[in-house]
Each structure stands twice: as structure tokens, then as C-alpha cells.
Regions:
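C-terminal structural segment of proteins
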Residues: 1-274
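A glycine-rich beta-strand to alpha-helix segment
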Residues: 276-292
Length: 292
């Protein structure tokens, strides 16, 4: 079967093609979709390559939101001064695959794929990320936490494109942290993922904490049960609590790695929290507006 290839230069053109050409799929990084095509899991009639849409290839902070375009790669995130000021996000971006994969893979693609073990998607969940979705009918803004319907299933419609991801610009009273545990040291799919975003008062005590967990159940999830428990605690107290408290939201599935996940989940949360608190203690955290 012949597969048509489209290479739009504008977002509106891509949205029109997606609406008009039945059976087509989008490709930006392609690290997930190309594997599915090669394995015969999907047989599209057409491929819409949106990598040439330059308006979706920027990272900016306007003081209200950090904006990450739908075509931005993990390598771009690693090199971005904007992402570099958000320690948990920078660490998550650098944890994805290998250097070669990070040059092409995108967080937008991983969010859309909804793999349970997607590194950066789990961290972005803790940052309260919103997706700006575009179709021929206009824009729709939806919170990342609301799109997941199950493993590899989302509420993103077949005619919608992730124009950008955005989350609130962090201030000097906020810190972020990220941890992943796997059996091998490199290029292994994460078995446990934890993201943390904390807001502290002038004495370094926790005012609020958002914890995200990935690779433990069908989708990445938030864990408010632990976030509520560490309110009012300082760094050391919060870490000690995290090491002892297993969040109910983890909901571990039966799997070969279940015992490993039971033994390491609390450690991952504690590590992410430690990094987040440490980020608030550094005096150089002025999240100035910037761009890639």
C-alpha cells in the first residue's frame, strides 16, 4: 500500500491535512510512531511530518508561563537556559534514551503516546502542564493530568495537534526535582519515576508540594496523599517522611518488577523532594524571561 508523505510549513496547513486526509498520522520526533509503523501495529495511508513548522520549535518564558513548542526536542530542552533553571525538568529531559534519541524525540510526542514510563511527561505532570491543542476548529487548552485515559490512550482527538505545552513560570520560592530508578544504568526503561515541585516559605518550610509518579501503573499520576503530609515540614523532615510513607496513588500493577518498585518508590520520591528543596535554597534562582 502506498503511503503519502506531507511536509507542511505552517500549523494551519498541517491541521487542514489532518482533517482532510483520512488515515494519516503525525510525526515530529518520530521515535514512537515510526517504531509502531515498522512493527506493523499501525498502517497509515499518509504521514504528516510537522518538523518544518518553525513556530512550534521555541522555548520561552514570558513571566506567566513557560512555553515549550510541540516540535521541541529533548536535546533542545537540555541546551535551553529556560529549562536549565528548572532542575527537575532539565534532569528529566537528560534522562530520555540516548543522546541520539534526544536529538529527535519530543516531549509532545511522548505525552501524546501516553506510555506509562515516559520520563519527561511524568515531570511535566508535576509542573501543572497544560496542552494547547489545535485543529481546524480552533484551539483547545487542557491540563495534562486530564488527558490520560489509560496506558497509551489519551483524550487528544485524532484531528488535534499539540501546538505547545505550558506551565506556570516558577519563582524563587519554588523548586523542582526528578528521580528515576531502573535496573540498568543507561538506556533502560524506567521502573520508577518521581517528580516533585515544592513551594516554601522564608524559613524553607513546605507551603505546598506536588508529587508525580510514573511507570507504576497504567498512567502517570499525581500523589496528593504525600503532598498533603509534608506541608509545614522542612527539607530533612519531608525527606524522612517520604522514605517511610508509601503513597496509595502508586497502585502497583502485578508485574515481574513489582517487588523492585515496592522497594524503591519511596526512595525515588525522597530523592526528587531533596532536589526540589535544594533548588529553593540556592540564591541564584531568579527565573528571568528568556528564550531558546
Amino acid at each position: 500500500m502506498e503511503t503519502n508523505y506531507y511536509h507542511p510549513r505552517e500549523l494551519e496547513e498541517a491541521a487542514a491535512l489532518l482533517e482532510e486526509q483520512e488515515g494519516t498520522v503525525l510525526v515530529n520526533g518520530g521515535s514512537d510512531i515510526i517504531l509502531s509503523i515498522s512493527a506493523g501495529k499501525i498502517t497509515p495511508t499518509g504521514i504528516i511530518d510537522i518538523r518544518g513548522i518553525k513556530s512550534m520549535n521555541t522555548i520561552t518564558d514570558d513571566g506567566q508561563y513557560v512555553h515549550i513548542g510541540g516540535n521541541v526536542t529533548y536535546r533542545q530542552m537540555q541546551d535551553s537556559p529556560v529549562c536549565g533553571r528548572i532542575g527537575g525538568l532539565a534532569r528529566a529531559a537528560g534522562s530520555v534514551g540516548s543522546p541520539v534519541i534526544r536529538m529527535v524525540a519530543t516531549p509532545a510526542g511522548n505525552i501524546a503516546t501516553a506510555a506509562p514510563s515516559a520520563d519527561c511527561a511524568s515531570m511535566m505532570l508535576a509542573l501543572d502542564t497544560e496542552l494547547v491543542l489545535v485543529s481546524v476548529r480552533g484551539e483547545r487548552i487542557v491540563r495534562q493530568k486530564d488527558i490520560y485515559l489509560g496506558a497509551y490512550k489519551t483524550d487528544i482527538q485524532s484531528n488535534e495537534i499539540i501546538k505547545e505545552m505550558r506551565f506556570p513560570s516558577p519563582g524563587p520560592d519554588k523548586g523542582s526535582g526528578y528521580a528515576r530508578f531502573s535496573r540498568r544504568k543507561s538506556q533502560d526503561i524506567a521502573k520508577v519515576i518521581a517528580g516533585a515541585v515544592v513551594t516554601v516559605d522564608k524559613k524553607g518550610r513546605c507551603l505546598s508540594a506536588v508529587i508525580s509518579l510514573g511507570a507504576l501503573n497504567a498512567t502517570a499520576v499525581l500523589a496528593p496523599s504525600i503532598g498533603e503530609r509534608i506541608k509545614g515540614l522542612g527539607r530533612d523532615e519531608a525527606i524522612q517522611l517520604a522514605l517511610k510513607f508509601f503513597p496509595r496513588e502508586a497502585g502497583l500493577r502485578e508485574s515481574y518488577f513489582k517487588r523492585y518498585k515496592e522497594e524503591t518508590t519511596c526512595n525515588a520520591i525522597a530523592e526528587a523532594l531533596d532536589m526540589a528543596f535544594a533548588e529553593t535554597e540556592r540564591g541564584d534562582l531568579c527565573y528571568a524571561c528568556g528564550s531558546l
